Amino acid sequence: MGGMQTLQWAIAHPDRVGSYIALACCARHQAQTIAFNDTGRQAIISDPSWLQGHYPDGKQPAQGLSVARMMAHITYLSETGMEAKFGRKRRDTVAREPFENYDVEFEVESYLRHQGQAFVSRFDANTYLCLTKALDRFDLYGTLGTLDEALHHVNSPGLVVGFTSDWLYPPQGNRDIVEALLRLGKDASYVELEMDAGHDSFLLCSPRLEALIRSY
C-alpha cells in the first residue's frame, strides 16, 4: 500500500513531491492478489462474530481475522525463504495417530498461528476489510487501460525497487511502472534486488537496500 500511495501522491500533487521512492509495489492488483484478499475477507465475514460489521467493542470476529492474516502472511514470504526457515521441522516429535487431532505439528503452522493471533490483538476486522478492498480497487490504468495517461502528471524524479522473490507484487509490475515513465520522458530509475524474503524483503534491514536509498 505504501508504494501505491507514493505513486498516487506523485501523480496527484506533482508540485508538492520533490522526489519519491516506491518499494515493492504495482499499478494495480492482478487476479491472484485479489483472490487472496477476498478469501481473507470471506474468512472474516463467515465468522459468526462479525454480525454484518456491527460487532461490539472488544468482541470482534477474532477467528476469521486470524485466519485472514495467516493466509495473507504466506503471500508476504517466499517458498525459498519458508523452506530455509521451517522446512518440515516439527514442534512435537512424539508419534501420534495422523488424524487424532489437528493441533500444531509443524513449525510453520506454529509460526502462522502466532502471526494470526498476534494480529487480532492490534488490528480491527472491519478495517482489514476496508483496507484490502481499497488495495484491490486501486488502479493506475484507470478507464483508459494505460499507465501513460496517469503517469504523465508526474514531474518529480523517482526510484522504483522490486525484489526477485516477491510473488505478491512481482518485479515485472514494478518494471512496467518505470517503463511507462521512461516512455513519457520522465526521470525514473528501476533497481531489482535479489533477496529471498518475498514481499517482506522491503522490511528487512538490508545493507544493499539501505545503501540504495541513501545514495538516491
Locate the predicted segments by residue.
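Alpha/beta-hydrolase-fold enzymes
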Residues: R16, A22-A118
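Short beta-strand/loop motif that positions the catalytic acidic residue
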Residues: V154, V160-G162
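Short, conserved loop/helix-junction motifs that constitute active-site signature segments
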Residues: L151-N155, L182-L184
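Short glycine-enriched nucleophile-adjacent loop
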Residues: G3-P14, Y20
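Catalytic active-site module of serine/aspartate enzymes centered on a nucleophile-bearing elbow/loop
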Residues: R175-Y216
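Short alpha-helix in the alpha/beta-hydrolase fold that links the catalytic acid
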Residues: T143-D148, P170-L181
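Active-site nucleophile elbow and catalytic-triad environment of alpha/beta-hydrolase enzymes
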Residues: H114-Q115, C130-A150
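Acidic catalytic loop of the alpha/beta-hydrolase fold
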Residues: A118, L135-D139, T164-Y169
